[in-house]
Amino acid sequence: FYARRMNKLGIRLGIYIPINVFDIGLKIDHYGSIVVNGMCRIGKNCRLHGNNCIGNKGEGRIDEFPMIGDNFDLGTGAVVIGGITLSNNIKVGANAVVTRSCLEEGAGLVGIQNKNLRKGNTK
């Protein structure tokens, strides 16, 4: 019953988030087009801004999923894919595509190449 009810609500809102992926404190700022793979693990106090995807890369790699720490902030249109690990307090900018791990706490990742703004990369 629960799964059917959540599936109907998810279809209506455009959100697909399986059970037990996020820890407590998930906040979704805007509804619509949020897809999270059920094998991902995401820590406490995650914030999604809409039009996001968190999952595997496809290409037959069904066993590689992101592991994300606490206080994660994913900007509008941003994507996190592949078997990567992201540390705590990371912010991902709008429309960024994160495909590489970042173990530095408090990093700010932007763009396709995952430039870390907290390290002084401003280009």
For every predicted segment, state its role.
Residues 50-52, 56-123:
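Glycine-rich hexapeptide-repeat left-handed beta-helix
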